[in-house]
Design a protein with these regions (language model features):
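Mature catalytic core of soluble alpha/beta enzymes
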Residues: 2-18, 23, 27, 31-346
């Protein structure tokens, strides 16, 4: 090694003496060795961050070279989740959604452009899902007791009354004045089918704007998005989809890379009554919990899309889903049938 070191200190000295070729080779080897040493990357920093919003925990796991920058990006993304909660919450009295629910039957309510745009998207989802997705499902969720967290079996008359006070066609949007109006009294918007997915997408945009290219963002565990890949795993972020009947078992394993996953299952919120299980996944057309599925998982480019469509696919079943799902969606259906196994739609 001593001749090589001398060559690095003064390459001209080496090259003044024969054999010149040998000297040049030594010099090149030494330079290459130093280059390798200089470019050895430091292991990436891992940061985990969480914030409570929309009644659940939003979690972020991210990697990068600079801990300070990661912390700033994670805090900014968390603030975005809190901001959206204050826009869409039906528990915060001064949120935009609460104001609409209180006043939109009495008079048109002017809302922010962001809120208006999201409502327009929700109306499109309702049309495309044949009404199986309906953001006006609030009265139905209330009469079934899911707002209180426990759930109970309502009388048929209560369900009928709730159905008469909902319906996406009874929401009037005025783009020119950016207003929302309800055509029926007692209506209320419920953000449960869109809020987490929308927030996750906004958090992802914030992280990318801060230069983050490796992160996993989770909204309550049921709606997640993987940015890039974690270190040493080019396939993406490892995600286990649990078995709907047994949490200790696995229905499927996937790797998320620049895509989202959302799952709707009858094990998330439910109650027992008269010997039956009643899930929180309501069919807004009938007023009763949907049956026939245990869980549905959707992989889509946006978390808003995967979260929203998980419920119509759950409600409408395999055949409808196979006919209508976009080609860039992947759907795992776990049907509630004896001996049935979870299967990905082709």
């Amino acid at each position: 090694m001593r001749p090589v070191l001398r060559t690095l200190r003064d390459p001209r000295r080496c090259c003044r003496h024969p054999p010149l070729a040998r000297c040049l080779v030594l010099f090149a080897i030494a330079c290459a060795g130093l280059a390798r040493c200089a470019t050895v990357p430091k292991p990436p920093v891992k940061l985990e961050h969480s914030v409570y919003a929309m009644g659940t925990e939003f979690g972020i796991a991210l990697y990068g070279p600079n801990a300070t920058k990661l912390e700033g990006a994670a805090e900014q993304a968390s603030e975005e989740a809190t901001r959206i909660d204050h826009m869409l919450s039906n528990y915060i009295p001064d949120s935009e959604l609460s104001k609409v629910n209180r006043e939109a039957y009495d008079h048109p309510v002017q809302v922010s452009q962001e809120f208006f745009d999201l409502l327009e998207v929700c109306m499109r989802y309702s049309r495309e899902s044949d009404g199986s997705f309906d953001i006006t499902v609030g009265p139905l969720m209330k009469v079934w007791g899911f707002y209180k967290g426990s759930g109970h079996l309502p009388h048929r008359a209560e369900i009928w009354t709730a159905l008469n006070h909902m319906g996406y066609r009874n929401v009037e949007l005025d783009a020119a004045h950016r207003t929302v109006r309800f055509k029926e009294s007692g209506m209320s918007l419920d953000p449960g089918g869109v809020g987490k997915g929308y927030a996750v997408d906004k958090m992802v945009s914030d992280l990318r704007a801060h230069g983050v290219d490796s992160a996993l963002v989770s909204g309550g565990g049921s709606s997640i998005y993987g940015i890039g890949s974690p270190p040493n795993e080019p396939r993406g972020w490892y995600v286990r989809i649990r078995d709907a009947k047994d949490e200790s078992k696995t229905a499927a394993v996937i790797y998320l890379k620049d895509s989202s996953l959302s799952t709707s299952g009858n094990y998330e919120k439910f109650f027992f009554a008269e010997g039956k299980i009643y899930s929180h996944i309501m069919d807004p057309r009938t007023g009763y919990p949907a049956t026939g599925m245990l869980s549905v998982s959707v992989i889509a480019p946006r978390t808003l899309d995967s979260e929203v469509w998980a419920k119509p696919y759950y409600i409408l079943g395999r055949q409808w889903t196979a006919r209508h799902k976009p080609s860039d969606f992947r759907v795992l259906l776990c049907e509630d049938k004896p001996g049935a196994t979870c299967k990905w739609l082709p």
